[in-house]
Amino acid sequence: MANVTVTVLARVKAKEGMQDQVRRECLALIAPSRSEEGCITYDLYQSTDDPTVFVFFENWLSREHVEKHLEKPHCQEFDQRTDGMLVGSEEIVFLKKISSL
C-alpha cells in the first residue's frame, strides 16, 4: 500500500501564567521536527481568542513518519519539560484531505 500523506493537529493548553514558558518549549520543537525524514510542514499557531492555547499544524508523508516523530528525543523532552505546565494532556488529531482546490 502506498504512503498516504497525513495532516496532524496537535493542541496544548498552558496553565494560566505559564504560556510564555510553554510557547518557548513549543518553538524549540520546530527546527528539529522540520529536519525529520517525512516532514512536509511543521508550523506552530497560538489562539487569538485564548493565548494559552497552542496548535501545531503538521503535514507528514505517512502516519509511520508521525509515529517515529513522536518517539524522537525532542518530543520526549518536550513532554518532560512541560510536565505540570499544561492543562490536561496534548490532543492529537489525525486528518486526511477530502477536498481539492
What are these regions (language model features)?
Residues V4-S35, I40:
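N-terminal first-folded block
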Residues V6-K13, D43-L70:
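Short, well-ordered beta-strand segments in beta-rich or mixed alpha/beta enzyme
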Residues Q19-Q21, V53, H65, L101:
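Intrinsically disordered, low-complexity acidic/polar segments
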Residues M1-V6, L44-T52, F78-L101:
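Glycine-rich beta-strand-turn "strand-cap" elements at beta-sheet edges
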Residues A28-I40, N59-V93:
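An amphipathic, aromatic/His-enriched active-site/gating alpha helix that lines ligand/cofactor pockets
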